[in-house]
């Protein structure tokens, strides 16, 4: 049988770039540039550097425990125990994806209202309608949008690069505006928007699941992660420079769809249509990924005993529908409250980012804890300089949380939401650990147990009632050979 073709560095980079970029990132670029001007490039570069440190830590964790389906939850389970794992992953990924998915849906509604102003439909109605359609479609299977997902994402990226370059070279002299490049008095103010810039680079960890299909993954996966982030940074720098030449900072700050504003000013109606079509397809693709991805994450955490078993229930097509119901309901409720202004959208994004940054802090903590716990365990990829990189990562991510929003009132509100949700999750985690799984709160699981959790045998042994409901059976993977098969223990005749 022919050997399965392995992925190379270009495929890994393409996957990483396609997964990280979303249309709500464009709002963040526009908001950051309208506040700082071109110095926002410095802010983006700092945030990119911190995210590169996180990517490298994720690579070491994946090298120690490869091919896990529970996401970063299983790494934390092996380093800090179930209590911290539940809080981190439910807050850092599930809650965050619900919040950021809501902002993507809102961008879809705002885009349609911008390009179709004559239709008397509110942005919330467009957004909720899209969520309902994607929810129904996802119930029918995993690969509903798989064939166009990457094409759409790469189309958005290519469009932004081209538009950024056209703006930089001032291809339309009539559209050029005369305005200052720098809007701040002190370059220390660039730190004030680190939280906003962080959002532009999240999601690089989603490269990890494809690592088994990558040739020489020990070297290519880390390089792919780093280069994905650098390529995105270059694309965003081009957009900021284009904004400076074409769009007034004031208009940019007010717009909820800055990419469409920029496209229309640069290329007229053609630019509006171009960016509208590409961005709406990208929103659909990203939101579809969010709906299915969160449901899969919930199912993965349920499989390792950290969430109720009903998250494992699937439709005949194999879709975990309880998680999908949760995602669709929460996103619809958030959008029903109204997300028409750029300020409310940015606030929503910053709130979600706080949870995600906290989860990234735990990634670095996991590396440090496992370095001390298992110093001699084999790792196909190991960070240089001991624990220096994860320590810098913890400091950098904590610094971004401290600078999550330049407005102190908004910052305190975000902290309040983060703290309130964390308390609720802590109460759930305490009772779940004590009453349901009956495990010590802070005692790490053995790595061999964490890696065994993905197998049906583990579920049958530890959760027999659940295994019975899921119709799991322990079947041998090896097919008996016929008596005349030569296994290499005797010479050929």
Please annotate each region the language model reported.
Residues 109, 123-173, 184-186, 224-230, ...:
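Membrane-interface loop-to-helix entry segments
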Residues 73-81, 113-118, 226-291, 307-353:
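TM-loop-TM module centered on a large, flexible mid-protein loop between adjacent transmembrane helices
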